[in-house]
Amino acid sequence: MAKLLKLTPTSNDSYVELKNIDNEYLNFPVHVFPKVIRDVINGLEKTSNFPAGATSASLLFLVSTIIGNKRKVFLKDTWIDGCSLWFAVVGKRGTMKTHAVDYMLRPINTKEIQFAENYEAEVRVFEAYTDEQKKEYFNETGNYEPVRKQMLVKNSTREGLEWLMYQNKTGIGMYKDELFGLFEETKNYSAKGVMEFYLDIFNGKIIIVNRRQAKPFTVENPFMSVLGSIQPEKMMIIASQYTDNGVVDRFLYVPTTDETPKFTLDDIPDVYKDSYTFFIDKMFHKFNNAKPAELTFSTESKQVVLARMGAFEDYKNSDDTSEAMSNYISKIITYFIRFTIIFNEMNDRGMVIQPESVDEAFHLCAYFIATGERTFAGFEAQSGLETICQRANAKTKSEMIKAIIKKIPNINTKTLMQFTGATKGLISQIKKV
């Protein structure tokens, strides 16, 4: 049984030990959020069957996108980071994950409509300017023409993302309903360059763009949070083709239930709609015109960070931790510090990271370690099934099913369906023989 970080009740513990996984850690820790958000997420799950993991990940994605480059955190001279977050919501079709994400992104979609209307109005005014007025416009804004403000992008090429980040200095959020397409981008045309591009964005490295028929430009502080959904069968493909891809272990995995909820006519109560809209509007107004600034850690918070880092390191270096999970923990540590920005800002705790923000970040990391264990264990299982089929020279669906059942008689039908792509009927037929 895999291990998990044991959560301690106070912030002053000098050591955090490891313990066995408990199912509670595979439920999204909604308790880390401010009460207004807890009530919204729990209410949406109860009234609309929206998975708490999907709504929570969507909220975190949205908050990180709103904050963007306006906040970084200073831990030490060699560790200054922002709050970009990459989420993969894993679930079958029809499990409400897409509906949950779409609902939580409504506020930003409303903003995008406003941005588009404002841009069109600015263009109409600009086009009526004289040459002298256009010069004055440049002197005042630094732009040769109006720039469309944008926070959310759904479909874009690498070139498009570079230009969007250049125009929108605060950063952007990318939502992909089918996240598998992003992994495909890192495999196809100019794959190496695309993969390095995404890794540079994740790490906030400067991007210098030089193209033959365009003026060069530089994105000094690239920022992009990512949210997408992916089906379990696509995860199987990722396990077989992308485990050496540096992009895979940058994602935080959010599993949702395989059960398809019963349809009801229950609507989302206005209290949840109003509370959520008010919270997001408040965050947006706070950061829309805010100047970039660095948060710092209080003396007490630094001690809590030190204790939690010790727990991560013990887990990472344990003989029971797989190589894949050991590598993944390094990324979790990165997210640990990024989460402190999110929680400090959501709770209006000022410009100094408070111990409560560190503990909330740690609780969230415990969840993602648990889901990471499950995800990477699935990758390892996938590799094992491939080895069985290769050794048996099994190529057709029937041959693969027979080879696997011979080696693993008790393997469940669901796993066989996901791995081979066979129907439940074919598998049952072969099992009876």
Show where each model-derived region lies.
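Phosphate-handling catalytic cores of nucleic-acid transaction enzymes
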Residues: 2-433
